[in-house]
Amino acid sequence: MTLKEIEVLLQNAVGGIDRIYEHWTGCDGSVVNLPDYTVVIDLTGGYHVMHEDFTEKLAHTWHRNSRSIGIAMACCKDAVCYYDHPDGVDLGSEPPTSAQIEAMAMLTAKAEQILGLTTDD
């Protein structure tokens, strides 16, 4: 699905979304059929919409799923977060691609604009 097509779904969700949660899946980068998320971004930056009703309550974030959308990059297989590691995280054998980071940024910016959210929300 294109960002332009996703704009329509975002417009349909105006007033029903207060938060955007961004994730990495921790799966192999080819795994995009993950229904706990609203949108999954593949290794090339392509968008895969899991649910066209963006107000549907999903299971992407523990105890914070109401009135939110979950956007995930399909990446970071074998990633580990370290409390005492100098970098804080090892992004694993499949770190996010530049295309995924750009696609995440573009979708987040468009969602904030359409939904009337800010980075403080």
What residues fall within each predicted segment?
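Active-site-adjacent loop/helix surface patches within enzyme catalytic domains
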Residues: 1-120
